[in-house]
Structures are given as C-alpha cells and as structure tokens.
Amino acid sequence: MLLLVGLGNPTPDSENNRHNIGFKIIDAINKKFGLSKQKPKFKGLLTTGNVGDQKVYAIKPLTFMNNSGICIRELIEYFKIDAENVIVFHDDLDVEFGKIKAKFGGSDAGHNGIASIDKFIGKEYSRVRIGIGKPKDKMEVSDFVLQNFDEDEMLGLEKITNNITDSISILIDKKLDLFSSTVNNKLWVLNVELLVCLMWVNLHSSTLSQTQAKPKLQIFLFVQ
C-alpha cells in the first residue's frame, strides 16, 4: 500500500501557481488511473484505487503548504502506512523547468512543505522534485512560487504531467533513478529566437507599431 501526496495550497486563486504543481500531478494520476472521487478526509482531498497491481491512496492536503505534515501523519497513522511507502510530489526551485529529480530522504532544501512533513513523519520517504526554475531579476522567491505559470510554461506543464503519469509504474516500484531518467528523456525544452520570426517582422514592419516588441518563440520539443 502506497500513499501519493501532492503539495500545494487549497485556494482557488492558487490553482495555477508554481507552488501547486504537486496538486496537478495528483489530479493527473486520479484521472489516468480512474481513482475514486475526491473526498475531504484527514484534512485533505483523498482518493483511492489501484495503479497497476498496487493499492494506492492519493491526497492533496488542505492545510496549506506549511502545515502539510499534519495531514500526512493523520492519514498514515490511520491506514498504518509506513513512511517509506510515502511518495511526495512538490515544486523545486533548484531543478530546471521541465525536469524532475526523484530521491529518497534528504534535506528539505528550504521547502516549507517538505520541512513540515519531515517534522511529523521523519525524512524516510520518497520525493519527486519537479522543476519550476528560478526567479528572474530580483523577484523574491516567495513571490515567484506563488505566481502563476506563464502561457508557454502551461503548455510544457501538461506534457510533464503526462510523462510522469506514463512512467508512474517505475516510481511505484521505487526505481527512483530510472524514473527520473525516463521522465526527463521524454521532454526537451528549447528557447530559440527563430530567423523566420525576424523575417516576418521585417516584412510586416509597416503594419507593426514601432513600440511593439519582436516576437520571441518558445518551442517545446517532445521526444517520445
């Protein structure tokens, strides 16, 4: 029996925040594997079902990020789930957007949700760190993680969640390194300014406002 946890904040305006990527992963798992309808239990939204041959519970804590551990401890004590059978999905500033890193144990690396879980159940559980990149310029980290993904990132995010759910059986078998490499090899993200865009701008410069910026195209190359 496994517990899958997605970290985030429960308010409607937080839905597309970078900090809420864990919630999106749980939603994708629920949909792909037809888990039960979400029910408010253990201070979270709980679903259950099977992923392959494995019985799983999946939860999105409603305690807000900094108190995530309260929800997790109540649930694992009730269902008698060992901490080593807990897998947590969360955002990570130190991982490039479009990449993931799965590991067992370790430090919280300044992530308040992970720090809360460590406090209530210890460090002996698996984490899937999902890259959101770093803030640009002088934006505060707290502002960056509570900011919505931009349009280009939302396009990539859908593919990331699909890649994770497609490879979830590897994760459930606790082959963390293989899971990371499998997911990461499916997605290349490339930022380019295409010559054709510049040519288009030059050809249509008479119809463009002088103050209008030249378009910059972000391409997501998906490798299956």
Regions found by a protein language model. Name each.
Residues 180-187:
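Short, highly charged C-terminal tails/helix-capping segments
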Residues 130-132, 137-146:
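Internal, active-site/partner-interface "lid" segment
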Residues 2-105, 115-126, 136-140, 155-161, ...:
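Nucleotide and nucleotide-moiety/phosphate-recognizing core
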Residues 110-113:
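Hydrophobic alpha-helical segments within soluble ligand-binding/sensing domains
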Residues 188-224:
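Conserved G1/Walker A P-loop phosphate-binding module
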